[in-house]
Amino acid sequence: MTLLALGINHKTAPVSLRERVTFSPDTLDQALDSLLAQPMVQGGVVLSTCNRTELYLSVEEQDNLQEALIRWLCDYHNLNEDDLRNSLYWHQDNDAVSHLMRVASGLDSLVLGEPQILGQVKKAFADSQKGHLHASALERMFQKSFSVAKRVRTETDIGASAVSVAFAACTLARQIFESLSTVTVLLVGAGETIELVARHLREHKVQKMIIANRTRERAQVLADEVGAEVISLSDIDERLREADIIISSTASPLPIIGKGMVERALKSRRNQPMLLVDIAVPRDVEPEVGKLANAYLYSVDDLQSIISHNLAQRKAAAVEAETIVAQEASEFMAWLRSQSASETIREYRSQSEHVRDELTVKALAALEQGGDAQAILQDLAWKLTNRLIHAPTKSLQQAARDGDDERLNILRDSLGLE
């Protein structure tokens, strides 16, 4: 039995190829059925995200194994093998285990240390379990990878610092306000960055979110997801005074929030402070706003300096994380190798127990017939000893006759002899 990890990711393949190798949720069951129907495959998990498509497999060794699996992947996606082969990576046993642990820990992600990948790996594992048989070693590998990812996040600072603009904006807000559970946040825009910001804020249980956007329909989809109120851009002037935090990211060529608008809001708030985070390019907030008392304005450049510092911290933490992964992968492989002896150990124990039971029954019968207890126990001990050492004795004698000192020493060691 061999463990494999094969696939493509953002480092090995352009998006034009990655999008052709994805497995959609609607067809995942069909893909797993097809994969597990391959005679060499004992169990499989398919991980498919925007940045990677990977197969994690437990397989029986055979000739041309790599060719057979590449052919299946190409046939399933109707791809030319040469197109895929140049971008495909292939990891086996210890390397496969290490790769999965690195992926689950965020060490192989586009954004180093990002936490979302662990949830994606867990979902891939859960999805592949629905009606599909797993090899026990594959299941154990995934469960171990989950615990390793948790250990990496607990014992290192890999996820402690923001390295995306959206996350940095939320981190800044949490640093300035003791708790987000008492603040109102106005989000201006409804694009991808604001979507990420809104989800981060929801996770931190912000008291109230308001989303202002040019098109109400797009904003409403996000608002329904995070429990926010939707307003139009023209309503910002009137509603700005409610916001303790404003985070803006639109594609507007001109500023949306001006100095006068913020002055009016501060006056209505009796100069309670406002945090404005402008992550738009061009800027959504007039730079002069930063000169107002109690208005704290941060631009995308301010956030970028935070991100650069934090990324350096994450890279240092990644060195510690790699050490953890190497150690855990080595321990897992030691466990896996030990499993190959499990069946032999079970058979040996069963055989010994059978001898014990057989001789015990005879001894008990002799006692019931009134035989001398001491003599019966001595006979039991003598016969049990002889039956149990018979096979090892023959093996020792044969090794000696053959002049096989290496085998003789192995047998001595296995019998606990000095």
From Swiss-Prot:
Which PANTHER family does the record cross-reference, listed alphabetically? Answer: GLUTAMYL-TRNA REDUCTASE
Tell me which species this is from. Citrobacter koseri (strain ATCC BAA-895 / CDC 4225-83 / SGSC4696)
Q: Where does substrate bind?
A: T49, C50, N51, R52, S109, E114, P115, Q116, Q120
Q: What does this protein do?
A: Catalyzes the NADPH-dependent reduction of glutamyl-tRNA(Glu) to glutamate 1-semialdehyde (GSA).
**In this chain's numbering, which residues are marked as the site (Important for activity)?**
H99
The GO molecular function terms of this record are: glutamyl-tRNA reductase activity; NADP binding
- Name of the featured protein: Glutamyl-tRNA reductase
Q: Catalytic activity annotated for this protein?
A: (S)-4-amino-5-oxopentanoate + tRNA(Glu) + NADP(+) = L-glutamyl-tRNA(Glu) + NADPH + H(+)
Other comments?
A: During catalysis, the active site Cys acts as a nucleophile attacking the alpha-carbonyl group of tRNA-bound glutamate with the formation of a thioester intermediate between enzyme and glutamate, and the concomitant release of tRNA(Glu). The thioester intermediate is finally reduced by direct hydride transfer from NADPH, to form the product GSA.
Q: Give residues annotated as binding NADP(+).
A: G189, A190, G191, E192, T193, I194
- State the superkingdom: Bacteria
Catalytic residues at C50
Note what the entry says on domains. Answer: Possesses an unusual extended V-shaped dimeric structure with each monomer consisting of three distinct domains arranged along a curved 'spinal' alpha-helix. The N-terminal catalytic domain specifically recognizes the glutamate moiety of the substrate. The second domain is the NADPH-binding domain, and the third C-terminal domain is responsible for dimerization.
UniProt cross-references to SUPFAM superfamilies, sorted A to Z: Glutamyl tRNA-reductase catalytic, N-terminal domain (SSF69742), Glutamyl tRNA-reductase dimerization domain (SSF69075), NAD(P)-binding Rossmann-fold domains (SSF51735)
Give the EC number(s) under which this enzyme is classified. 1.2.1.70
Question: Its pathway?
Answer: Porphyrin-containing compound metabolism; protoporphyrin-IX biosynthesis; 5-aminolevulinate from L-glutamyl-tRNA(Glu): step 1/2
CDD domains for this protein = NAD_bind_Glutamyl_tRNA_reduct
Q: Pfam families under this entry? A: GlutR_dimer (PF00745), GlutR_N (PF05201), Shikimate_DH (PF01488)
Q: Which residues cross the membrane?
A: none
Family assignment from sequence similarity: Belongs to the glutamyl-tRNA reductase family.
Q: What class of enzyme is it?
A: oxidoreductase
Which GO terms are recorded in the biological process aspect for this UniProt protein? protoporphyrinogen IX biosynthetic process from glutamate
